Amino acid sequence: MPVIEEIDDIDDIDNLEMDLAELDSTMKTPVAPKIVPTVVRSQDQEEEAYSAAISGNAGSGSGFNFVNSTTGQVEKSHSLTKEELDEIKEFQMLYPCYFDTRRTHAQGRRAPKDLCVENPLAKTIADAARSLGIPSIFEGSKTHPQDFGNPGRVRVLIKENGKPFVSGIDNKRVLMKRIGEYLKSHPTTLESVKQLPYGPDFDNVEPKKIPLLKGTAMNDIVPLHSPYLTQHPMTKSLYDAPPPPPPAQQVSAPEKQMKMPKNKFRVVRR
């Protein structure tokens, strides 16, 4: 005979009015919308922490870095007003990969091949713009999607109120040609990367050449806050020494089996 069970706690009773879509994320009903699962990857959190550290150490922060037209040094700006930010929108951007002779046009190169150099840096591009009298803004932590290992970009003001800021430089093509000529006469060295305002965290970091990866367009001289030098979790395994191969085991040749001698006598039937 069945036994009737008494239930004292009302919370123990199944809620039959619950919408099924709240239990099954693949269902969608008029009552409850489809539940979209949230995926949080550990590398995303590492990337955010890394970007925040670089923004603080490289001197980019929330403002911009202006290049002093007299000294050529990169100086951090104060907080910009809305009017100043609107003026900056008229500036055009230049990335180092535009002048990289190791790259093809599909890999990000924009300047003519004969005016491109190896290991272009954003700081040298800013120096070239300064020498031409072009106002420039240096952004140390910004990177091109195809050149993430060489951080830095430069904003330049070519025209103001529709008129060229410098006579003879009417457009971006002409400016890139003049900058390419400057880069040709100012090749990148290990001392060049020390001119950036990295901050105290990079005082003991020495610039060094990095090995080039086969099939990858990249610099072998990069700024000190490059992911190639800071052991970023996404790139630190690129240059780890491969494990040594296991010792070769001497395999003895199999012994030859003795074959039975052939019977060379013919049997003649009578």
From Swiss-Prot:
Keywords: Cytoplasm, Ribonucleoprotein, RNA-binding, Signal recognition particle. It comes from the Eukaryota. GO terms for cellular component: signal recognition particle, endoplasmic reticulum targeting. Residues 237-270 are annotated as: Disordered. Residues 259-270 have a biased composition (Basic residues). Gene3D superfamilies: Signal recognition particle, SRP19-like subunit. InterPro entries: Signal_recog_particle_SRP19, SRP19-like_sf. One of its GO terms (biological process) is SRP-dependent cotranslational protein targeting to membrane, signal sequence recognition. GO terms for molecular function: 7S RNA binding. It is found in: Cytoplasm. Its main location: cytoplasm. Signal-recognition-particle assembly has a crucial role in targeting secretory proteins to the rough endoplasmic reticulum membrane. It must be involved intimately in the translocation of a wide variety of protein substrates. Belongs to the SRP19 family. Fungal signal recognition particle consists of a 7S RNA molecule (scR1) and at least six protein subunits: SRP72, SRP68, SRP54, SEC65, SRP21 and SRP14. This is Signal recognition particle SEC65 subunit. The gene is SEC65.
